[in-house]
């Protein structure tokens, strides 16, 4: 954090190196420079102490903490851990060299961790986490319920994104339940997330856009099941095994990404698969939920809770009989009910 004397010195040094005749740098100019420096200093040390500002203090981007948290808490998603953290680190480190926003599309069945990871990204990036004024979240049919209103939704998204980026270029936009949005809703957004995305003087290149969708969840499960039955370990699968499949499915299946110019223009940087949960992963989710209730999952009575939920509430896919259909999505309430 820059001290006021240092800030004032820096501003005055600019005057020194400017190719101006000495007599043209009058006391009023020097006074104006001092006032600017003083205003910036007091904004940083007074206003921004009590209100959220678009600065490093309020946007600490604690990606190392995110990495440790995902390693500790994210269950069954090795591909996500391998790619999300490096993608964020590279985008943030590129700073002024970045030529486009970071655009990521999460795909997978319900209960595989898409919202969980998006929430952790917001918490790591912003001091206020998902409550930050610089985090905007849209929710499927709740925000875009009518197919007939697509044209209006496009304008709504475009204007809202621009307004937010004017306030803070380092904003995060999360679009959840993309598969429940009408086709074409994102077409006007394409120009804002493309290369050299400066619109009306607004720098969009530092922003992050995350799209969450159940689209292709069944495709991921089918492909993973086939791969595993052919003798390959789940943990040996890579992003390249799924990314082409996700891009094709998102473009062709119903939802906000169907036939979208965002895919046609190749502005989505990463299509990330969230793999379906196996029984062992669901057990780990149940153990984590019990720990959240300050219960030891190894105790006999808590082991009984896990066993009862697994046997009575978990259904598996018909094709491979490997993957829990709802993943870990409904476990919170089931554990709470079992405890009380």
From Swiss-Prot:
Q: Which GO terms describe its cellular component?
A: endoplasmic reticulum; endoplasmic reticulum lumen; nuclear envelope; nuclear membrane protein complex
Biological process annotations from GO = cellular response to misfolded protein; chaperone cofactor-dependent protein refolding; eye pigment granule organization; larval fat body development; lipid metabolic process; membrane lipid biosynthetic process; neuron cellular homeostasis; nuclear envelope budding
Per UniProt, ATP binds at: 108-115
Q: Does the keyword Electron transport apply?
A: no
GO molecular function annotation:
ATP binding; ATP hydrolysis activity
The UniProt entry lists the main location of this chain as endoplasmic reticulum
Q: What is the effect of changing residue 226 to N?
A: In strain: MEL14, ZBMEL82, ZBMEL131, ZBMEL145, ZBMEL157, ZBMEL229, ZBMEL377, ZBMEL384 and ZBMEL398
Give the source's domain of life in one word: Eukaryota
- Summary of the function given for this chain in its UniProt record: May serve as a molecular chaperone assisting in the proper folding of secreted and/or membrane proteins.
Q: What is this protein called?
A: Torsin-like protein
